[in-house]
């Protein structure tokens, strides 16, 4: 286990029924690049997303939303809408709205146009109240309150594990939440200097390709839904709780989801509305949010105000860090950004205080490493300022404070691939450009990243082998675009000696064995060990059948290329399967607990090259080199795609995306993708993902 070239060996006791881990170099199928299995379905339009759901007699649902940031609801008159043909209405009787776009009334009609007519027929009378929509204004004493009572923290599968924190609340500020390590006062006393900076980051909306949506139908007393979700089973569980049903009475399907970065856990309000409308109407109902309401109500990455104070020695060693953050997730919680400062580098002493600030804006939620981009920006900016103050190479400063053996190797690999040694040349070229009157300057920089290894307990996989040789793999996990079918098939193909394309991977159905939600980078690490266990158990049982066909001992049977062999005798896969007793051979695999292995925090480093027009402020990213430790990749193409996607979202966040709020009205002015700009293909730089060879030594995969 450990970094290639620096590995350690250790004896372990395997969990009961769990296969032994792969040995180094014994993976003929996994750990490689290959085309994704669902690609043809997607590019030909055969993949069915929730937006595509259609059924005879189906109704189309819409939500009447508040045009105000803060108001009392005086009355809701649905009488005209109720008289329209085929219209059903769900009126929860809301008394107060706290953000522009908050749901007030849901309805469904035979066509989308009819639903829009019904929306216009609903008359809501508001008593508009004062609002506060900026982080700075909401923090002030005497600011308009968003909530009169204390708010409890709510967590989803996209958040870091841990209990919700009970924190003090004064005005609109909830917190601070204190945390840290070491003796901060001692660290500052030992410092030869201090540096303090403040950074701010803006809101980033999820802007999933497929907006949030749900299709619901009641079949007797069973609720069947198709959902655009990151959690097949979390949707099932929430709907079962709302409607007081046993879990087997809620069936959730999620074979294809058009993107999810933390906002698609659970049924959400639109999903509950959809199911209630379907129950009232006795007909299937589709709710597909429009882009505007999706941007307003479905969640976002909170903004942040971060203060970083570093104590340092003149050789660049950081002796202590004092960190304070405020952020607004609108009417929600969870804006903390201190995870990075506490864990990314080897600062010996850290004191952190994180506070949520409520505003009259749509709720924030988990989004791709919650809190880390904001915290990373703050800490890395402070390190850059410190390097400048000390006249020190920024990379050398980071190496001075980075005790991670893995990331030190990544810094070295990345610097070489990127050409970090060009710094002096670039400085001279910029001086020449300035002398010639050119506004263009070239710059390079580097920064670290960090995430954690989380495992969802209870994941189970079923492998079913039919007598005609068909092999099916079943798990209820959803695919949010990462292509999870492909690594599942690769693992089973490796154990069974079959072509990857020959396997049928069936996912996204809550009637299948339990699978993890897709959040916090938990999916593959939770699922693949269970896949391998199921595949090994199925192979062992099939070897028993093959031994009888070949007239050999089970210990002599080998399988490769779809052929069983033993002492000169051969039988192809289908011939052996035809001798399976009964109709099918079924084997299951469970995700066993991790054994004690290497440090499996996920370390990474990025190097970037940009061109800046110093007159206009336009920044063009030319190249990014990203070096990452992802353990042992099952499917390299998929891992590299995830790295590329994260880089593109990061560039988009930094340079393109900006939610614009009118402070006078409290309304979001650009809830769209025309004026809320996201990075496009013409803005995409050269991206070089590099995976370091690391052996976690914690499970069978």
Question: For the regions a protein language model found, what residue spans apply to each?
Answer:
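Generic N-terminal targeting/processing segments that precede catalytic cores or assembly contacts
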Residues: 65, 92-94, 620, 629, ...
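Cytochrome P450 core scaffold surrounding the K-helix E-X-X-R motif
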Residues: 631-635
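Active-site "cap" helix and flanking loop/linker of ATP-utilizing ligase/carboxylase catalytic domains
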Residues: 637, 641-675
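Conserved phosphate/anionic-ligand binding catalytic regions in large, soluble enzymes, centered on
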Residues: 261, 265, 375, 484, ...
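Generic long, charged, amphipathic alpha-helical segments
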Residues: 501-507, 677-700
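Structural alpha/beta core scaffold segments of enzyme domains
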Residues: 1-627, 684-686
